[in-house]
Amino acid sequence: EDISLESLLAKNALETRWAFNIPTLARKVPGINGGHLVEIGARPNTGKTSFHASLVCGPGGFADQGAKCVVLCNEEGAHRVGARYLTAALGKDVHNISQNKETALQKWQMMKDRVYIKDSTGKDMAWVETLCKTFKPDVLILDMGDKFAKTGGFARMDEALKANAIYARQIAKMYDCAVLYMSQLSADAENKVVLNQSMMEGSRTGKAAEADLMLLIAKNPPVEGQDEEDTQRHLNVVKNKLTGWHGIVHCDLDYKVGRYTA
């Protein structure tokens, strides 16, 4: 390997090829690059799908930056994930978009050329690797990452998830793409704002050990008498080999259009 001063500086300058479009996050972790494994976790109904939809299709997102993005969804239907990407791209809910199709068409057509969404129910990581060979994505989203794991041959689930994360990291490095690995958090994270690595569902240390960056998304606990859910979200940066900063940054989720803003 070339470890000359020029080479090291040049390679590290590329660490933020794909910039985050959430200002509070970008100030601490500017972005990601090919070869990075980013593990993202949250409790159900926190906004995991909206999070990656906003990063990819929101204003200044990965697609706007020219990244070829592949989204593999094995939980929600591809059409539902696609709708989240559509609203994040256009900043309007589906009803408003349907009322103004001609206005929406040009913007969405440009996004659609850079974003590929595919149902991957029942598939494994070997299938994911084959797809990467063909499509050569810049950014690969696994939603949900754990559901690509093969459980046969492992004594415990955490061992299977560790092997799955190792495979995801190998794909990131071999095919020079940034992999966003979406995960559920365990019940330990319910109604908590400050989260940690041990709250990953079904995992011990192994899965977390593979990540270059780990972001855990929290929301404010409900308050008695509250008519609707608080839109504030808290991004816990619990592992960060990219810039070394750890802590919590705050933002808001516009759930009607699936955009994270700050």
Roles of regions detected by a PLM:
Residues 74-76, 177, 181-184:
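Conserved H-loop
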Residues 6, 65-155, 163, 228:
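Conserved inter-motif catalytic segment of the P-loop NTP-binding fold
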Residues 154-168, 178-182, 215-216:
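A short alpha/beta connector and helix-capping loop motif
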Residues 109, 125-140, 170-175, 187-262:
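C-terminal regions of RecA-like/P-loop NTPase motor modules
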Residues 1-92:
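The Walker A/P-loop phosphate-binding site
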Residues 25, 142, 177:
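Catalytic phosphate/metal-binding cores of nucleic-acid and nucleotide-processing enzymes, i.e., regions
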Residues 38-40, 70-72, 118, 180, ...:
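Hydrophobic/aromatic beta-strand patches that form the interior of the parallel beta-sheet core
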Residues 59-62, 88-92, 144-151, 171-174, ...:
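Conserved, well-folded catalytic cores of nucleic-acid-processing
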